[in-house]
């Protein structure tokens, strides 16, 4: 089984990807393993598009950070990726589809949906709030 934990950053809400990161994981006999040498994290250029100030405030990626980076449409998923895991993962999948990725055979596992189900009364379900809540 090939699964990745995926996160993207975009130039605006529902925009083009300017950073794509993933960590391939293996799950065997109920144990999750991660080979840190296989972690992928790449900034991408978006042509003449400008990064919105709202997006900059979220991810702190500035326009000068993506100068001379590969164009976003060069991104490819690792071969034989069957599962993509992430927080609000549908957003990230829509983002990588803008790179030309075919996600039709990929199964999404949304940690936001899982968190809402596990802790329905939590004050917030974003990753930062969950970390504080779980680590109490």
PLM regions: where:
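Conserved non-catalytic scaffold segment of RNase H-like nuclease domains
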Residues: 1-107, 120-136
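Short, flexible loop segments at boundaries between secondary-structure elements
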Residues: 112-121
């Amino acid at each position: 089984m090939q699964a990745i934990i995926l996160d993207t950053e975009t130039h605006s809400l529902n925009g083009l990807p300017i950073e794509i990161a993933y960590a391939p994981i293996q799950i065997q006999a109920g144990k999750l393993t991660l080979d840190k040498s296989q972690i992928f994290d790449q900034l991408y250029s978006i042509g003449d598009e400008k990064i919105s100030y709202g997006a900059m405030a979220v991810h702190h990626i500035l326009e000068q950070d993506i100068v001379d980076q590969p164009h976003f449409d060069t991104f490819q998923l690792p071969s034989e990726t069957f599962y993509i895991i992430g927080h609000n993962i549908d957003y990230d999948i829509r983002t990588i589809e803008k790179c030309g990725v075919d996600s039709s055979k990929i199964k999404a596992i949304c940690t936001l949906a899982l968190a809402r189900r596990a802790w329905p009364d939590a004050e917030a379900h974003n990753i930062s709030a969950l970390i504080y809540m779980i680590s109490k």
